[in-house]
Amino acid sequence: PGNSGASASGISPMSSLQVPEFPPESSLLKRDYLLHSSGLILCGQFSPALELLISQMSIHPQGIPVLQSFMNSYNSLYSLYFKKAHIACASLDLEHIRSLVPGVQLSLLCLYEYSIGLYVPSGNPLKLSGLMDFACKDIKIANREKGSTPRIYLDQFLFSEKISPASISGYHTELVSDISTAAAIATHKADSALGEEYAAHQSGLLDFIPLQTLPMYLVMETE
């Protein structure tokens, strides 16, 4: 399957592309080089599935050099729209994805599906069960940054339920990854956070309360 996909997309074998050695601080130089070569720029936040995909693409005999730019869903699509990336990894509904890349013919591939839900301390001492619990004045949350899927998911819920973000304790505490919000719960800096399931299990100190299954898309411009 890997060979047929490579030939169908017109990708040359890795041996035909020699990527110059750039110093660590020159990631922008590497990005610009790959944008104008046979390399690949992929934007998306960390996930085990995405890391596995990138590693396999890089080591496959007909693979290509891949540079991952760590961005949330919104910023990944923004980069795709302005041609600063070849692939955006986004976990939004199709209508939102297409609205953020207007006038561009897109191809979408569902890479995987995952559970989004609540991170809570082991044993769930506050007996949290859903996002409505965030409105309780005694509950402090660790929030994600604007443009990330957990933040968009939470903001859509608050809007639909006519709940003011100002009433949510910790709403303006913005962290930039699911790992960091999970760590905030594990270290008792907050009571709960919303995020992808894998991060809850890494510390061994948290329980995960699933709320919904979401798709993770690879979004590409159709040539």
Language-model region placement:
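Short helices/loops that flank or line small-molecule/ion binding pockets
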Residues: 74-88, 174-190
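Acidic, polar ligand-binding/catalytic clefts
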Residues: 87-117, 122-123
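Short loop->beta-strand "edge-of-pocket" segments that line small-molecule binding or catalytic clefts
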Residues: 35-46, 132-152
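Flexible hinge/capping segments at coil-to-helix
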Residues: 111, 120-141
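N-terminal hydrophobic or amphipathic helices and topogenic motifs
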Residues: 1-75, 81-85, 101-106, 126-131, ...
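Periplasmic-binding protein-like
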Residues: 110-117, 127, 201, 205-223
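Ligand-binding cleft/hinge of the Venus flytrap
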Residues: 52-62, 132, 144-146, 150-173
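A ligand-binding cleft/hinge motif common to bilobed small-molecule-binding domains
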Residues: 89-101, 182-212
